[in-house]
Amino acid sequence: WILMSDKLGKSNPWYARFNVLLFLWVGVGFFTGWKQYSLSEVNSHINNFQIFRSSFGHFFQQMHLYPLYPKEYFDLYLYGPVFAVLMAPFAYLPLGWSVVLWNGLNAGMLFWAVWNLPMVRMHRVAILWIILNSTITALLNTQFHALCVAMILWSYILMQRGKLGWSALLIALGVFIKFYGIIGLAFFFFTKDRLRYSVYLVFGFAAVFAFPFLFGGVEYTWLCYQEWLEVLSHKNTLNVDIRNLRTDVCVMGMFRRITGDGTLSNLWFLVPSLCLSAWVYFQPKKWALLDFQLRILALVLIYIMLASTGTESPTLIMAFPGVGIWFVLGEKSRTRWGWFVLTL
């Protein structure tokens, strides 16, 4: 019913009511946080959150952010210094409360972003149901990616509403947390006030970049930025190892595993795909059209996962809002239904 209808009609069915959806989404966030915390071995079920939470203490004690700390968590911290500073509220709360609120924040912000997309209500409702399962997967891993895609959606929404300063700030924040926010720059040509947007972007990037220096000092924070780039390069090397079945779940990774060639370069796929995307994007007469903007939004959300060596099951929430937008905007043909079902 949700996916086949474009209008609510006179009725307001339970599955489309704002209060029902809000309760469901925030409830899912709180419940998954509580569930993962309540399981016996804490580090094995909320490990990602432990990494995020511990980064605050490491930063303010001026410890290296990016080595392994096996007594605290496993895996590596892969986020920028600004993220460590912003984890302050969660670091001071008791662990149980903080992980519940973390998941609630991720779920709530993504819900609120989708609900504010410039689309008819039934389309927004359909997208919320389409992405719910992948959101739960991300929440069960206490990941950041639901909040990350919410920030990207909000950077578009705010740009579309003319609030260019806030849009630019969110793009900058996304870049300096985990680079994914860079795709928000795809919305640059959708505003007529590009000069003002450019100024906001410059100031936004400068402000977010400089923010950690206020707390860590120049020498230590600069070292953190250098080590961040190094660990991302190291992580990419680990991701493309064909013996690692968890990550590199992208187009390039698929071909690396099919051919058994772990040295297959990403450029063979990135260059032609970026050229094709640019050909689709650079249609200036369509930049002001809402339908075109939404389709580009869907494109960049899906593309970032298809082309990232860091793609794994919990990160797919980054792409699924794009899948939802793509599906609801098009005619519900058998082909579209087939691709949609295959994607799910």
What are these regions (language model features)?
Residues 32-33, 327-344:
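Aromatic-enriched
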Residues 88-91, 187, 325-328:
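Short glycine/serine- and small hydrophobic-enriched flexible loop segments
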Residues 171-189, 308-318:
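Transmembrane helices and adjacent periplasmic/lumenal helix-loop junctions
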Residues 5-166, 191-313, 320:
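Primarily membrane-embedded glycan-assembly and transfer machineries that use lipid-linked glycans
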Residues 1-3:
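Short, Lys/Arg-enriched N-terminal segments with co-localized hydrophobic residues
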Residues 313, 317-321, 325, 339-344:
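ATP/nucleoside-binding phosphotransfer catalytic cores, i.e., glycine-rich phosphate-binding loops
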